[in-house]
Structure formats: structure tokens, C-alpha cells
């Protein structure tokens, strides 16, 4: 029979060999692989996998998805297996409105003073909270960052921050 683990490894290698424009921030990574034949001496004939595909720009995400699909088709032929996939979810890039960013800048100055205004940054990747502009293209949106002494890091199980900083966001 065919070993599903071989196909998973080939998918991983295919992702590692995807090369996009180096000026574009993007990534495609396997985040979950499950292949279980039921016993240690049974080669698994089926597997499931999940991946995280993200980029700074939504058009780059779409291009990555197209290249990944092309890779799946090639691997399907190479291993003579059926690789089925669905893009169940996506992680969009930020669509920042200059008008909304200017309003946020003025609000920060008004609420907190000029010393609290930092230069705008371009986020290097996509995130789930950018859905509002992809689902409502007419919506003008921006993001603000509030220093809140977050530690030890975002998504860490023991993440904590200064909750008093939330009032700054309310004021802005």
C-alpha cells in the first residue's frame, strides 16, 4: 500500500520549496499532521493535515493558495493518491484606510497628547482580526497599538498585561 506519511512529508517539502517574491512577507506552514494505521506495525493509508497560510497582502495569500493547490495536484499525480483539501479558513492581511488612520492619529493626540503618538508600522503578516475589511470592503479601518506591558508574550499561556491600559483605548 501507499504510505500516507510519505505524502505528508512531501507536502512539507513542497511548502518549504515555495518561493515567492522576497519583498513580500508571507508563510505557509503545516500546523497539524495525523496519520495512524492503528498499530505501530501498520502503514497508514490515510492522513489529515492542517496548514497556516498568511501574508501581509491578501493578493499574496491568494497566490500562495494557488501555488499550494498546484503542488497538491503534482503530488497527487506523483504518489498516485487522492489529495483532498478545503480552504476552511483564511487569515487576511490588513487593509488600512488612510482616512481612518488619520482619524486615529488625531484621536491619540487629542486623548493622550503628542508624546503618545508613534509612527505607523506596517504589520508583517495577517491576522484573524482583519476580517472586518474583507467582509465589508466599504468599511474604512485602521488599528491602534496601546502599550500595556504585555508579558511574557502574545499567545503565551501565562500572558498578562496592565488592564489599566484599556482605558487609554477607551479614551482614544
Where are these regions (language model features)?
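C-terminal helix-coil-helix/basic helical segment that borders enzyme active sites and/or dimer interfaces
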Residues: 81-84, 109-123
